[in-house]
């Protein structure tokens, strides 16, 4: 196995661990509530604590990398993650569980941007589309299997095992990082927490906008839409849960297509098609009912469009980024990724509240979906400012 493949394996394993821990806890909330005799709103901090720790430490990742080198940061992050996972499973109080989840998030928040930067440095720009496809497939697999794995562990063992179960993977990743990663001499020069000057790069700036407007908006539509589908369209909880199946299939096809066609046609057509597909899927929700196939069609279009955009954005973001700038660029990218998860749900919830203050209930929901579709189309207004021909020329020069 080549060195760059080893680096990619370590990063993808770490990325999988991060996503599993972000999504697996919620399925154990009822069992945790019974153990700690608390409410769902308080238990939400078991998930929020992880996300908070992850988000808060991301800006420090590039500075720490320059101080001690990427290998040591990755090993430190995996050690923190593993220790916090074991401690979370042994927690005797809810307060200690939340505290250990925050530390888990700190480990993940160091691992992901540093691992991504190190991995991207090993691949030339024209090779990164397929690498991005592998990353996006992990991003698709982890949320899809987390609830099933978590539910099985809670049902057969205990909620504590959702934390213990990740330990073997974390330990294997730690050992592989020890054996495979080379120690790089740290650059001791001072660095800013966030190098905002990198946003002058139009590809990075545009890719971050895409993440806010497309995956971010889908998160918001998915969160608010569950209430709409169950209480307005009269779909059962089981039926709404099954909608993620066509979404996942369409996402897989879109991610595969990006890896195949990005180097041939560039980001512009893929972004335009993706935005139009997701916007159409969102608008289809206006006319859904439990007796039609429109909900499945809507989620299929959102899965195809959203994943086409997110994988294209991932492939485009660092095309013009120099090797020495990758730690800073990766920190910005991952901070924006976390922001998109928060901002999408918050923005659409506020839009719905505002619409409900002025419109009848059904019209308010429709207005929120129209607003979400409009937000999804925002990148289309900017994509034509990108020099698609220049991107293709750069990619072809790399391959020649």
Which residues fall in each region the model found?
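MFS-fold secondary transporters
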Residues: 84-89, 104, 177, 284-286, ...
């Amino acid at each position: 196995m080549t060195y760059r493949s080893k680096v990619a394996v370590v990063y993808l394993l770490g990325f999988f661990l991060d996503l599993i821990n972000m999504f697996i806890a919620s399925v154990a909330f009822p069992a945790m509530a019974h153990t700690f005799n608390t409410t769902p709103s308080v238990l939400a901090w078991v998930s929020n604590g992880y996300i908070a720790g992850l988000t808060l430490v991301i800006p420090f990742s590039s500075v720490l990398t320059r101080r001690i080198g990427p290998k040591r940061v990755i090993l430190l992050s995996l050690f923190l993650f593993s220790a916090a996972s074991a401690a979370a499973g042994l927690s005797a109080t809810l307060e200690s569980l939340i505290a250990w989840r925050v530390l888990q998030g700190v480990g993940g928040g160091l691992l992901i941007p540093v691992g991504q930067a190190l991995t991207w440095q090993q691949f030339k720009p024209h090779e990164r589309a397929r690498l991005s496809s592998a990353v996006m497939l992990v991003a698709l697999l982890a949320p899809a299997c987390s609830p099933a794995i978590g539910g099985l562990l809670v049902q057969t063992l205990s909620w504590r095992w959702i934390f213990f179960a990740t330990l073997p993977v974390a330990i294997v990743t730690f050992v592989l990082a020890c054996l495979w990663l080379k120690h790089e001499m740290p650059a001791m020069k001072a660095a800013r927490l966030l190098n905002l000057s990198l946003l002058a790069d139009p590809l990075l700036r545009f890719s971050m906008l895409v993440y806010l407007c497309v995956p971010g908006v889908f998160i918001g539509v998915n969160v608010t839409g569950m209430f709409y589908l169950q209480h307005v369209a009269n779909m059962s909880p089981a039926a709404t849960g099954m909608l993620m199946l066509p979404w996942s299939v369409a996402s897989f096809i879109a991610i595969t297509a990006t890896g195949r066609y990005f180097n041939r046609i560039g980001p512009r057509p893929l972004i335009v098609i993706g935005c139009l597909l997701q916007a159409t899927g969102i608008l289809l929700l206006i006319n859904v009912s439990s007796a039609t196939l429109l909900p499945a069609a809507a989620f299929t279009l959102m899965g195809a469009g959203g994943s086409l955009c997110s994988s294209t954005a991932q492939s485009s973001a660092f095309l013009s980024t120099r090797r020495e700038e990758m730690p800073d660029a990766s920190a910005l990218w991952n901070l924006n990724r976390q922001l998109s998860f928060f901002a999408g749900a918050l923005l659409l919830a506020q839009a719905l509240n505002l619409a409900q203050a002025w419109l009848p209930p059904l019209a308010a929901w429709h207005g929120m979906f129209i607003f979400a579709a409009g937000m999804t189309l925002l990148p289309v207004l900017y994509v034509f400012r990108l020099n698609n021909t220049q991107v293709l020329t750069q990619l072809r020069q790399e391959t020649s």
